[in-house]
């Protein structure tokens, strides 16, 4: 029916993706060999959103795995669900991008991109009615950011009317893996603003905080972080995969969340998050879920929604619950915290309800918010970018791959424009508009 083709690129993307397929396979009752061992017809009814049925009743993920070095893919292949993927869908080079966006976008990545696109076409052709693509990648490295954005722009050319959803891990404020992260991230955002439809912004630091504070894990691993991300990824598409009372799909989400085409960077959250010890002491109710869902500590990227205002938001509930109660709770949030919502978009929270909760929970909720506070994150990256670019530090790595300084300047100003657009709508109020119109008439 409404298929989604999943693409994961680079080390970060492949690790998130691997975790995501564990979660989705588990939800649909698929074991690591691709065989169905579920207990409900609902698991199979729309399994083809993410899986292809192959010969002998095997289910194969519609996933494309790409990287410029074989390392991460080998570990995916030898991981718990490594044997479920179609072997031809592993596309990798041998050189690596060395955290260099230019290598991923212009040199090494460009050599590999055609073989990736062949696999993309093959997957898209086997779809009955393709809904869109979802891409997992990070913006700080070389492959996920450089080659990831190259692939997104190529897919955009070939499938202009399909949704393009990304799960992008941005560099964290305090934890840095690479010195050139600000360069790679800025060049990537420059691409994502133009070519993606919806970007779910994630960052490791916010995810670590959730693991420490909420889940009370003393030594969180990347596996724990990726598990959080995959909970959100599964929540976003659950309406496509399971029956529900109020459905949402990628396009409905976009229509409800994006008031202006460039402002499509979202904060995401998932509830309930409880530490293992205190799980059994919590009753799960719609008000409880709603409360945790809107909590700033619950956001998976390091921007504080209380520093901005929500343009729009979307809540995707899962489980048996009354839609009336969901609507009441959502209205309640908007009425009590009206200063955090822009008043010139009335009823700007969309909710949907899917009947089937995730494994092991009675009910859950996924939150997607389009908040002007996300500019904090862009601002932070932009400041680090400018600090280095002013001195032209590390630039030779990029110009050596044939890039021009001009491209850096363009990316920088595009990012700064984005920040000021968010600021402009944060400050806008319903009344102001009238005054301007009046002045124009007089003139």
From Swiss-Prot:
Q: Which PROSITE patterns match?
A: TUBULIN, TUBULIN_B_AUTOREG
- List every stretch annotated Disordered: 424-443
Q: Which InterPro entries match?
A: Beta-tubulin_BS, Beta_tubulin, Tub_FtsZ_C, Tubulin, Tubulin/FtsZ-like_C, Tubulin/FtsZ_2-layer-sand-dom, Tubulin/FtsZ_GTPase_sf, Tubulin_C
Which positions in this protein are listed as binding GTP? 11, 69, 138, 142-144, 204, 226
Organism, per UniProt? Answer: Chlamydomonas reinhardtii
Q: What else is known?
A: The 2 beta-tubulin genes of Chlamydomonas (beta-1 and beta-2) encode the same protein.
Q: Name one GO biological process term.
A: microtubule-based process
| Protein family per UniProt | Belongs to the tubulin family.
The superkingdom of the source organism is: Eukaryota
* UniProt keywords, alphabetically: Cytoplasm, Cytoskeleton, GTP-binding, Magnesium, Metal-binding, Microtubule, Nucleotide-binding
- For this entry, the protein name equals Tubulin beta-1/beta-2 chain
User: Bias regions of kind Acidic residues — which residues?
Assistant: 429-443
Q: Does the keyword S-adenosyl-L-methionine apply?
A: no
């Amino acid at each position: 029916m409404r298929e989604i083709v999943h693409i994961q690129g680079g080390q970060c993307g492949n690790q998130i993706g691997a975790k995501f397929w564990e979660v989705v396979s588990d939800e649909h009752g698929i074991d690591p060999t691709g065989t169905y061992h579920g207990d409900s017809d609902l698991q199979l009814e729309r399994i083809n959103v993410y899986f292809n049925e192959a010969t002998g009743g095997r289910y194969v993920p519609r996933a494309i795995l790409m990287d410029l070095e074989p390392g991460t893919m080998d570990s995916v292949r030898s991981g718990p669900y490594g044997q479920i993927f179609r072997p031809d869908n592993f596309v990798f080079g041998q050189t690596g991008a060395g955290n260099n966006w230019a290598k991923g976008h212009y040199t090494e990545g460009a050599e590999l991109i055609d073989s990736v696109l062949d696999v993309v076409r093959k997957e898209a052709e086997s779809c009955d009615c393709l809904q869109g693509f979802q891409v997992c990648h990070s913006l700080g490295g070389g492959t996920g950011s450089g080659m990831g954005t190259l692939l997104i722009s190529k897919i955009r050319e070939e499938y202009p009317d399909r949704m393009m959803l990304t799960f992008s891990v941005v560099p964290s404020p305090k934890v840095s893996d690479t010195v050139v992260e600000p360069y790679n991230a800025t060049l990537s955002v420059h691409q994502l603003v133009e070519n993606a439809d919806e970007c779910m912004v994630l960052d490791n630091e916010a995810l670590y905080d959730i693991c420490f504070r909420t889940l009370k894990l003393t030594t969180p691993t990347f596996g724990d972080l990726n598990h959080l991300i995959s909970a959100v990824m599964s929540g976003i598409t659950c309406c496509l995969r399971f029956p529900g009372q109020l459905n949402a799909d990628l396009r409905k989400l976009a229509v409800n969340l994006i008031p202006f085409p460039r402002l499509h960077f979202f904060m995401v959250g998932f509830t309930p998050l409880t530490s293992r010890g205190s799980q059994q002491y919590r009753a799960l109710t719609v008000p409880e879920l709603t409360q945790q869902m809107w909590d700033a500590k619950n956001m998976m990227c390091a921007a504080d929604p209380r520093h901005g205002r929500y343009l729009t938001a979307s809540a995707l509930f899962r489980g048996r619950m009354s839609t009336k109660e969901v609507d009441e709770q959502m209205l309640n949030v908007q009425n009590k915290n009206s200063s955090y919502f822009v008043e010139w978009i009335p009823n700007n929270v969309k909710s949907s309800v899917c009947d089937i909760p995730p494994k092991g929970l009675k009910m859950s909720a996924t939150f997607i918010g389009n908040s002007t506070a996300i500019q904090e994150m862009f601002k932070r990256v932009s400041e680090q970018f400018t600090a280095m670019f002013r001195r032209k530090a590390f630039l030779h790595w990029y110009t050596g791959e044939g890039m021009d300084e001009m491209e850096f300047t363009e990316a920088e100003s595009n990012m700064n424009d984005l920040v000021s657009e968010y600021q402009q709508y944060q400050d806008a109020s319903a009344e102001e508009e009238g005054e301007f119109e009046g002045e124009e008439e007089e003139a």
